[in-house]
Amino acid sequence: MQKSPLEKASFISKLFFSWTTPILRKGYRHHLELSDIYQAPSADSADHLSEKLEREWDREQASKKNPQLIHALRRCFFWRFLFYGILLYLGEVTKAVQPVLLGRIIASYDPENKVERSIAIYLGIGLCLLFIVRTLLLHPAIFGLHRIGMQMRTAMFSLIYKKTLKLSSRVLDKISIGQLVSLLSNNLNKFDEGLALAHFIWIAPLQVTLLMGLLWDLLQFSAFCGLGLLIILVIFQAILGKMMVKYRDQRAAKINERLVITSEIIDNIYSVKAYCWESAMEKMIENLREVELKMTRKAAYMRFFTSSAFFFSGFFVVFLSVLPYTVINGIVLRKIFTTISFCIVLRMSVTRQFPTAVQIWYDSFGMIRKIQDFLQKQEYKVLEYNLMTTGIIMENVTAFWEEGFGELLEKVQQSNGDRKHSSDENNVSFSHLCLVGNPVLKNINLNIEKGEMLAITGSTGSGKTSLLMLILGELEASEGIIKHSGRVSFCSQFSWIMPGTIKENIIFGVSYDEYRYKSVVKACQLQQDITKFAEQDNTVLGEGGVTLSGGQRARISLARAVYKDADLYLLDSPFGYLDVFTEEQVFESCVCKLMANKTRILVTSKMEHLRKADKILILHQGSSYFYGTFSELQSLRPDFSSKLMGYDTFDQFTEERRSSILTETLRRFSVDDSSAPWSKPKQSFRQTGEVGEKRKNSILNSFSSVRKISIVQKTPLCIDGESDDLQEKRLSLVPDSEQGEAALPRSNMIATGPTFPGRRRQSVLDLMTFTPNSGSSNLQRTRTSIRKISLVPQISLNEVDVYSRRLSQDSTLNITEEINEEDLKECFLDDVIKIPPVTTWNTYLRYFTLHKGLLLVLIWCVLVFLVEVAASLFVLWLLKNNPVNSGNNGTKISNSSYVVIITSTSFYYIFYIYVGVADTLLALSLFRGLPLVHTLITASKILHRKMLHSILHAPMSTISKLKAGGILNRFSKDIAILDDFLPLTIFDFIQLVFIVIGAIIVVSALQPYIFLATVPGLVVFILLRAYFLHTAQQLKQLESEGRSPIFTHLVTSLKGLWTLRAFRRQTYFETLFHKALNLHTANWFMYLATLRWFQMRIDMIFVLFFIVVTFISILTTGEGEGTAGIILTLAMNIMSTLQWAVNSSIDTDSLMRSVSRVFKFIDIQTEESMYTQIIKELPREGSSDVLVIKNEHVKKSDIWPSGGEMVVKDLTVKYMDDGNAVLENISFSISPGQRVGLLGRTGSGKSTLLSAFLRMLNIKGDIEIDGVSWNSVTLQEWRKAFGVITQKVFIFSGTFRQNLDPNGKWKDEEIWKVADEVGLKSVIEQFPGQLNFTLVDGGYVLSHGHKQLMCLARSVLSKAKIILLDEPSAHLDPITYQVIRRVLKQAFAGCTVILCEHRIEAMLDCQRFLVIEESNVWQYDSLQALLSEKSIFQQAISSSEKMRFFQGRHSSKHKPRTQITALKEETEEEVQETRL
């Protein structure tokens, strides 16, 4: 990016914004790239602004008990803000003086006033000079205020982000993503938009006082009649605004519901397609959309009436101001036209500028208070290490995630006077509800010496991760002592990849040591994966490492932790996504050998890991079940495997015991129904209130399996006898106050969000503990749309020592300067929809022909306009054929100081009424406005329906190219624009064009010479608009692209916050965030500057036009006093309205870009058409292109498939048409009812094969089910043959019944039967409403095991004969998995089952195994054959596992085999040399 020329520009260049001309010229001639944009001036850089505001905020905190952020902002920006305010006031004052000169010019036409006539030309020059002065004052002032607003936003963005990195985990768990979105994306944008109007809080009253003084001098008491009408109008607008807010509040809930379900579908589009739910989901969303549009229309009508009332008031304000005066004194044309000009300015000040300024200040103070509260929140405390400690010591440590109970617990504590409950279970009692919470860790004692390895194990929610958080300082111990000896390194259970290269992710800002780096890469088995990339370890990884498999991400995260030279390594389940082949290699070479001399704490559930650990800690419900060595464990706790690890002794349990385990062990949340009347059948319940809104999907829910969260009834609670109304709160993805206002035309990102990651309410900690897709790299590419891109805001810093945070404890490599804007853009891989710089005519044509009634409405608008023009021409005809004889019909009355012209009947007065009424009719336009707005909203409904259908039926290869956030933006921001902004903007543009054309006709009829001046002005306006639009729209697009990395970086930082803190890399990420801010600032600053360039030149053209009109009028009108007044008044009206019309056309073009983006999605090729095209290209018998179902029995859905036999012939799978084959020429067959296990390294293509079975990818070859080929069956019929359990469990917001049977195909009896069969009945019965109980937020009240059972139930209900299971045991503790394993055996006894798993024990029920390696079938045989000497499968099973699982089977034949790896086998001596 080039340096900004503003810093070296001359005063004249700055005044006229000429320094932007090169970028405008380049944008008109060529396509603008990021490198073409100038850097933001140094005064606008995020580093400078952040440090400036941070310094003042720290000073404010240090000096006062109650620090105020407004004071820190005042010290930073006040004086420049005041200076530009004074300039703005001087520019506005000229508007009040212009009518005075206009009245003097009109008065000069009095035949007896020869003095005034002689100076008329000088009065005209003075009037023109006022316009010039106003232009020179107004535009620099507006630009300066916009720039200050941009600087304030940038500074607070940075401050909030820094604070986010320092907040305690307890505070983060209370902050929702929606709150952050509202705090930043919606609220802070108001500085950009509103600061230019903030000064009217004092300018408007001064201006009204001045105008009323001048009107009093002109009309005396009559002037207050018009002011009274304006005040009434303001009250009327306030009433309409209140009604509009009511409709918007009702609409907000429906928009939220629609966007939540839409985001859930986008996030789980793979599952929706696999279940064949496209039609059901489409119908569900369209029903919500229909209700939403009813509220949208009502709100639009209110806005329409408000806007119309503003224009409609123009005539009546003038009429009421003049009428009392004319009744007493007669008609005085000079005063009439002067009053018109005064009232135009007065109306704008009273009805628009002052109310808007009041609203801006009100919103700004409220927003600043929110940010201030945020900046004062509690920060996390780093656990200081003790150099005297040899390893790590814990003594009687107990810890609570107290804030995890949400604000309901907080409210209870406050209402009880913060009294501590002495009960062991910390019960908090209500009148009919109970919230029960236990400590997440209780009385933990351990002592690890330096160099030892501690293995921590236990069931889900036992407190394993919480223990690591204690050591990191993320969780504060409520009692006990914790000591450790030195620096800590951390590997999270949830792999986190930052935007950057593979090498940067591993080094993570630490000094580069080549030998250490290569040793770590080798030990983590990354060499083979790195060699597959063209750029090797310099390959740039995008958002969340989307190009990597789950196993690759996990190993990079592990390598990052190992590369750091630390004294203590915390490894939280680092092998969860690794296949059995890789896991054993990484554990041996990395954890056991490379890190042999380091202190390690490993969270694991593998028996082999426990055997090799120096000490073992088994946690159960937060308590220490066992602490000691493995030999001690075997002697003291022989039952631990069956009780906590859940191995095959589960099979020995009785049926009743298994049912108990199902309903008790899996349950994270329990319902205390001791007093709640849940037995009432028709009582409506939802997860609402404080618990429902504050604690959904929190990390704490995963930590504490014994903590009970009550389902809050939708009725008032009584706490200590006081009623507390719990209102149902919803996170709206668009602003509460104005659903459409979030969708600013200059931004392509939804101002909400997001994240819309399929959760209606999600705490920040959920981001850190969200389970990403764990499939192979290939599957991940096909499911790019599943990843989340919550558009979340940033948070700020609150620390007394400003500079201490910048110090790093490790030796770091300063790579700040190596990060340029291009790299930053590449890292975030923003989704950019390529559309032309200016909206094409084809887009307008498609839009206006979308609805048959829209063309009729437009024709009606033109007819109404022609009637109005005809009326104006008729009045002109009367005027010319009935000239006023001022000598016979008029009287001349002389005042003491003024000569007044009075006309008797005055056709001029009639004509003046026409001028007012004509403008009013054109502005109000009820008969054409309401139908137009109504029809345009209907067009928005059609576009939404078509786009939804297109996305749901789009191929996965197409969706993989789009971001989830980008798709959701179309359904949120762009649809909001189509609903709220576009209808009224198009209406405004049409009526403004009609006003201009009508006024030109009138003026040209009165004075034809003016028409000659108007035509060149119109041509220049149109050409200048086209010239500006080419660059402006490109700058907006670049600005929008620059906005995405800001929020993406924040989300990325939040997901890896624990890792960032553990590595002390906050400063590095602050620098990266500032780079993103500067990139956005550069684009937005250029757009503001070029906009001022355009607006100033529009004003300059207007000044030239008015000069020409004024002098033509003065020199050619002669004695026509009324004609001169009409011409000058309408000339001012023409050009001001034409300016408005040009700006409105630019707004229309900007908003129509949303229509263009929607059309891009609508035009996406559907899956069915894509496969039809593929089938047509296949060699077929005969020449017919028509698909023919050869197997007649397929048409009968109850017959096919009957057995579940599969035959795969020469199957080749690609993700893209032009991509490499992931699987190549695969052939095999599966017998009916057979169970087949898929084996292979991470990324070998196991999940890809399952996707190919479902026809999710580009496939060639043939797949047959019971003799029926895939190319002879429709896509929906083919997928219905399969029952699917995907890696990512999909629970959408809806009832149990809807989640199990969204098509409404089955009766309750059948659903209950299946629920009982899979073990889900006892779970559903515990919820109020049972099958009608509404699940929200991804079913947060269910454990992961329950959700898997829901998927099993869906497959059973589908009556499918072939079941595809993609890692169903991922993130399940052993007991939970044994329950699901038992259900699988019983529910799908007669079905063909294809299972992809990483757990060896999970595969033991399979009769045959398909081993995939290097894109081909390596082996396909039975278990016995795979355990033979020549099998590669046996290397993944240790000798102890063979003895355990396969006693008597081939145990004597075991010999070590060559590993499938590109790494060379290390000798023990080599390992010793490379230990850390």
UniProtKB/Swiss-Prot annotation:
Residues where Phosphoserine occurs? 549, 660, 670, 684, 698, 710, 732, 763, 785, 790, 808, 1440, 1452
Reading the lineage from the top rank, the first entry is: Eukaryota
Provide the residue span(s) of the region labelled Disordered: 1446-1476
The protein's recorded glycosylation sites are 889, 895
Q: Where in the cell is it found?
A: Apical cell membrane; Early endosome membrane; Cell membrane; Recycling endosome membrane
**Gene Ontology cellular component terms for the protein in this record:** apical plasma membrane; cell surface; chloride channel complex; cytosol; early endosome; early endosome membrane; endoplasmic reticulum membrane; membrane
ABC transporter domain segment(s): 423-646, 1208-1439
Q: Residues that bind ATP 1, according to the entry?
A: 401, 458-465, 493
Where do the ABC transmembrane type-1 domain residues begin and end?
81-365, 854-1153
**Bias category Acidic residues: which stretches?**
1466-1476
Q: Chief subcellular site?
A: membrane
The entry's stated outcome for residue 508 to A/L/Q is:
Mildly impairs protein maturation
| UniProt xrefs under NCBIfam families | CFTR_protein
Name of the protein in question: Cystic fibrosis transmembrane conductance regulator
Origin organism is Mus musculus (Mouse)
Encoding gene per record: Cftr
